[in-house]
């Protein structure tokens, strides 16, 4: 049914479409309306020169120059994309490193790669306005610095699509950020109403949304499998598709230090693996984090070729509570980039 839905109550929705209004009743509902780019008060995207991330899929034109505002995951991926197209790119970084919250060494590796491609990094600059200026735009920052370019793209986060759903009629509660509150079954405070994906306020990853859908189906069908596990968002693997690729999972080194937790950190460069030399791409590294007392694998970060693929090995180890000894006892393919994981475990 193509239309706009809104709740009439906890067991009924109204759907307005070109064919008129329909009412649907049910024992269970899944809200998966996603999110949209966050637009601050100081900016008015026009879809031509001042863009949101949605306006860039695909870009209507290949800009000569572009200012990217926002240095999180989405922002750096657009920096990679537009610089690959040959655009002059300036990244406005509100802090002193890109990818705040990520491994500082991984962020530094990406910054070096960006600088090598001619990307300009404007650090410690918080954008306060993006304005049209002739045939281009100007990004104004709180410290007086300005960036002029033919285009600008906002990449400063997202907000949930909950407007128009009439959630109050169903009694569904939101959190302080406006996302739908869910429990470990992805169920809201109203029995039979579930939420998944970006609108749930958890990790905004397709893999997480798909797994949430699976867990919801299991809960609805009364799955009582002995191996059933609730979602642990702290153990979700994620990847950043730049060059180099960056991927991580589990406990971060900085997070452990901030909490005073003792960890063992082992870092191995890809240059130590024959496969990296065969590829003539020795850049990047594998970082493995484990418990020094038990040897349990707690997390890891990978920077380099196929990082998004290789992180799955560490993700499995983290989820299954494996130890570094388990990795050492595994017969990996040779030559393979994954051998760096063995070296890190050793």
Question: Which residues are covered by each model-predicted region?
Answer:
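Rossmann-like dinucleotide-binding cores of NAD(P)H-dependent redox enzymes
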Residues: 57-58, 63-67, 73-138, 142-143, ...
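Core beta-strand elements of the Rossmann-like FAD/NAD(P) dinucleotide-binding domain
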Residues: 19-28, 142-151, 189
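Glycine-rich dinucleotide-binding loop and its adjacent helix/turn
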Residues: 31-91, 120-121, 168-185, 189
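Flexible, glycine-rich terminal cap/loop adjacent to redox cofactors
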Residues: 236-346
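Short loop/edge segments at beta-strand edges and connector loops
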Residues: 1-4, 9, 33, 52-54, ...
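A short alpha-helix-loop-beta-strand transition element characteristic
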Residues: 36-38, 173-175, 223-235, 261-266
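Feature captures the FAD/FMN-dependent oxidoreductase FAD-binding
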Residues: 1-28, 121, 128-138
């Amino acid at each position: 049914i193509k239309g706009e839905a809104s709740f009439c109550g906890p067991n009924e929705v109204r759907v307005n479409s070109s064919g008129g209004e329909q009412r649907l009743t049910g024992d269970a509902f899944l809200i998966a309306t996603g999110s949209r780019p966050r637009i601050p008060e100081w900016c008015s995207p026009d879809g031509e020169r001042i863009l949101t991330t949605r306006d860039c899929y695909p870009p209507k034109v290949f800009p000569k120059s572009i200012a990217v505002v926002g240095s999180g995951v989405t922002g750096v991926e657009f920096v990679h994309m537009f610089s690959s197209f040959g655009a002059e790119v300036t990244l406005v970084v509100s802090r002193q490193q890109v990818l705040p919250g990520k491994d500082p060494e991984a962020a530094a590796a990406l910054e070096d790669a960006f600088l090598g491609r001619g990307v300009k990094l404007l650090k410690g600059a918080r954008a306060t306005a993006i304005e049209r200026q002739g045939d281009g735009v100007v990004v104004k920052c709180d410290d007086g610095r300005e960036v002029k370019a033919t285009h600008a793209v906002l990449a400063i986060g997202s907000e949930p699509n909950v407007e128009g759903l009439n959630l109050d009629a169903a009694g569904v509660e939101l959190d302080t950020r406006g996302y739908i509150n869910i429990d470990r079954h992805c169920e809201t405070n109203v029995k039979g109403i579930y939420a998944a994906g970006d609108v749930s306020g958890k990790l905004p990853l397709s893999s997480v949304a798909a797994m949430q859908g699976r867990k919801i189906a299991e809960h609805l069908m009364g799955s009582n499998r002995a191996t059933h596990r609730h979602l642990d968002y702290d153990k979700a693997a994620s990847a950043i598709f730049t060059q180099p690729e960056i991927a991580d999972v589990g406990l971060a080194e900085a997070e452990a230090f901030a909490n005073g937790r003792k960890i063992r950190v082992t870092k191995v460069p890809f240059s130590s693996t024959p496969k990296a030399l065969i590829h003539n791409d020795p850049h990047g590294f594998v970082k493995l984090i484990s418990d020094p007392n038990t040897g349990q694998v707690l997390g890891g970060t990978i920077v380099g070729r196929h990082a998004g693929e290789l992180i799955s090995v560490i993700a499995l180890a983290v989820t299954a509570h494996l130890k570094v000894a388990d990795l050492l006892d595994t017969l990996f393919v040779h030559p393979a980039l994954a051998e760096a994981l063995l070296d890190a475990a050793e």
